[in-house]
Each structure stands twice: as C-alpha cells, then as structure tokens.
Amino acid sequence: IKTFGEGATAILAQSIGGGGGFVGASKDGVALGGETQSNITAGDVTVTNSSLIQTTGKASAGLIAQSIGGGGGVVSITESEKISFGGSGLINADAGSVKVKNTGNIATAGITSPLIMVQSIGGGGGFTTTSDQTPALSKTNLIRLGDISSQRSKAGSINVENSGTLFSSGRSSSA
C-alpha cells in the first residue's frame, strides 16, 4: 500500500460510538464527538497486516486502529479556527478493545506521520495534526481535546504485535 499527499493514511480502521470519524481539513470550525448521549459503545477493532506500507505526505500515518466511545477520530488541519474534539455530557461512552498484528514493513516520510497508532478511548479524544501554515492560537482559535462532564466512560484493552520493520523519517512521527 503506497499513498502520496497530505492526510493520506494507508490503513484507517475505526469503531466510533456517537460521533467522530475522519476530517481531512477545514477552514471553519470543526466539531467531532457526541453530546448528551448515554450507553454508547464502540466495537472492537482488529487489524492484521502483512503488506508493505509506505506514505510520503504530511499527516499520513501508516496504520491507525481506533475504538472510541462517544467522540474523537482523526483530524488533519491546515487552516483552522475552532476545533472541538471529544464528547460532552456523555454517560457510559465505552470503547472496545483494539488488536493489531503487523508482519509487514511500514515506512512514513512526512511530518506528524506515525507508523502505527493504536487507541482505545472512552468518551472523547483521538488524533489531530496541524501543518506549518496553521495559524497561531489566539482568543478566536481553540483546540479542545477530550470530553466535558462525561461520566463512567471507559476504554478497552490494546494489543499490538509487530515483527515487521518500522522506519520513520518525518519530524514528530513516532512508532
């Protein structure tokens, strides 16, 4: 699997209960997540990869696997004013377990392009990237990660098995 260009993640597997998803870019406000919801459950996520994965663009992860109860997801921003990233007033917003088994080689070259990202998040959160052109935050700019006044939300277990070679050359691009 090879991708080129900004925000071009190779594999994105998500189970999100009550909101979230993937937003490539926005010039205006962005809101990801549920509000005033109860008993939201995201399912389990399992990814098995044996292929070669290569990405070259900014904010282009190799593999992302997420189970997020009640909000969150993936946002890649180049120009943004307001971002609300998570839930509000969520009750029992539970995430499932996430399992990744990778035997393939993964290489990313862009900035903020993690090789493998695995998350189980109850009630909000996720992954946000910004570019070098993103304006500095001021009173009119806002980035909020996480949930507000959520109750009894919990995350599931995470299991990652990797026997492939991982290589990242971009700034802020972790394994």
Q: Over which residues does each language-model region extend?
A:
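Low-complexity, glycine- and small/polar-enriched segments
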Residues: 1-175
